[in-house]
Amino acid sequence: MVKNSFISVIFQEKKEENRGSAEFQIVSFTNKIRRLTSHLELHKKDYLSQRGLRKILGKRQRLLSYLSKTNKIRYKELIGELDIRESKNR
């Protein structure tokens, strides 16, 4: 799990009002993705978890593309802090 000051700031900025923001959702999806990835390293044939992982990856990718279109600076900060690769534009 990623625990650093940036993520704690996102979680604590506006506790209840902030849950709908794209940044909060991206951070929570990233935590779920990392948890599922470590689970799948142990259980390689858990196909339902693999499907869930692919769905969460797609949701996070859509949110990241939305954030890059609306706020490029915040997008760059977020992918830098979470160690996520920048997506290729198609």
Swiss-Prot record:
GO terms for biological process: translation. SMART domains: Ribosomal_S15 (SM01387). One of its GO terms (cellular component) is ribonucleoprotein complex. Keywords: Chloroplast, Plastid, Ribonucleoprotein, Ribosomal protein. The keyword Ribonucleoprotein applies. Pfam families: Ribosomal_S15. CDD domains: Ribosomal_S15p_S13e (cd00353). The keyword Chloroplast applies. InterPro entries: Ribosomal_uS15, Ribosomal_uS15_bac-type, uS15_NS1_RNA-bd_sf. Coiled coil: none annotated. It is found in: Plastid, Chloroplast. GO terms for molecular function: structural constituent of ribosome. PANTHER family: RIBOSOMAL PROTEIN S15, BACTERIAL AND ORGANELLAR, SMALL RIBOSOMAL SUBUNIT PROTEIN US15M. Belongs to the universal ribosomal protein uS15 family. Part of the 30S ribosomal subunit. This is Small ribosomal subunit protein uS15c. It comes from Gossypium hirsutum.
